[in-house]
Amino acid sequence: MKLMTMPSEFQKALPILTKIKEAGYEAYFVGGSVRDVLLERPIHDVDIATSSYPEETKAIFNRTVDVGIEHGTVLVLENGGEYEITTFRTEDVYVDYRRPSQVSFVRSLEEDLKRRDFTVNALALDENGQVIDKFRGLIDLEQKRLRAVGKAEERFEEDALRIMRGFRFAASLDFDIEAATFEAMRSHSPLLEKISVERSFTEFDKLLMAPHWRKGISAMIACQAYDYLPGLKQREAGLNHLIVSLKDNFTFSDHHQAWAYVMISLAIEDPKSFLKAWKTSNDFQRYVTKLIALYRIRQERSFEKLDIYQYGKEMASLVEGLRKAQSLSVDMDHIEALDQALAIHNKHDIVLNGSHLIKDFGMEPGPQLGLMLEKVELAIVEGCLDNDFTTIEAFVREELAT
């Protein structure tokens, strides 16, 4: 197969391939970018593989950076762009089901491609637009099928994270997993416990943000892989609820909304501990737990001004997005009206602060000062007090007199 037109991302990088070939080596576009071009999807990263060894690659170009030279990767700075160029390589026995014990550089493209995970990711493209397909990846692309390169059992035993990648690709590409590949994923799912939680989180997160995320979750359920992921053991019912409880065409607006609804569907009692088990950042934990709290408030009643002040318009909109996907009542105009009606959006908007209370009223730093500031803040938010210096002073005097 030959591409009639090279996408602009590849055209810009063609001089890189040309320079390498003029130096006497082979060079090709490889991996996900080739797959995405053939599927007419946006290209994110342009990866180049070459028969030149790292030091040989560095000798060809004036500006290079050693970003992973021990694995054969050199970053080339050329024509205003940055390109990762990796030497063809083979990999020795894997340790810990996630990384090869040794990487060996080779001159053969086919040897390099055979170590890759799925056939649709094992395609290469030369400078003339000719697709090199050693493992029937083009047929799999045409039939929307995800199939492991070579023996599926070996691919997943080498790197168990490929199981999560399989679920993610099913979700992002809307592909079905080929039977032998699926069976190997199922039988090797216990190895997911050997994978770092951070790497599993990255793949699961990408799955949830994919347009066909239900397909990825369904495959995960069918493989029973969830039993080997943090907080998901014996959670099949909750995962099924996650799939069926939202409208068919719904996709999550952002990562916070996705993980919040995962925990809502699973009826997680302690969201923070659940997210800690996934080793997420403290900021992520705080935002998602607040989002769940606001979702539960909305289950009981309509939003009020204090809700929008405390949680923010953006978070309230994420809640309404989930409600809309469940065919529940939604009122985005109400959120906008409440936000517009707020005299302040955070305590720093208040014209009077603690320093004024200490200076003008002789208050001491401590709990009483903090309580007075909270009273002022709440009164302004609820519309009982204007955000005006003189008015607030009068309010404070009255409060201190009682």
From Swiss-Prot:
One of its GO terms (biological process) is tRNA 3'-terminal CCA addition. InterPro entries: Bact_CCA-adding_enz_type3_sf (IPR050264), CCA-adding_enz_C (IPR032810), CCA-adding_enz_firmicutes (IPR023068), NT_sf (IPR043519), PolA_pol_head_dom (IPR002646), PolyA_RNA-bd (IPR032828). It catalyses: a tRNA precursor + 2 CTP + ATP = a tRNA with a 3' CCA end + 3 diphosphate; a tRNA with a 3' CCA end + 2 CTP + ATP = a tRNA with a 3' CCACCA end + 3 diphosphate. It comes from the Bacteria. GO terms for molecular function: ATP binding; CCA tRNA nucleotidyltransferase activity; magnesium ion binding; tRNA binding. ATP binds at G32, R35, R116, D159, R162, R165, R168. Its EC number is 2.7.7.72. Mg(2+) binds at D45, D47. Keywords: ATP-binding, Magnesium, Metal-binding, Nucleotide-binding, Nucleotidyltransferase, RNA repair, RNA-binding, Transferase, tRNA processing. PANTHER family: CCA TRNA NUCLEOTIDYLTRANSFERASE 1, MITOCHONDRIAL (PTHR46173:SF1). Homodimer. This is CCA-adding enzyme. The gene is cca.
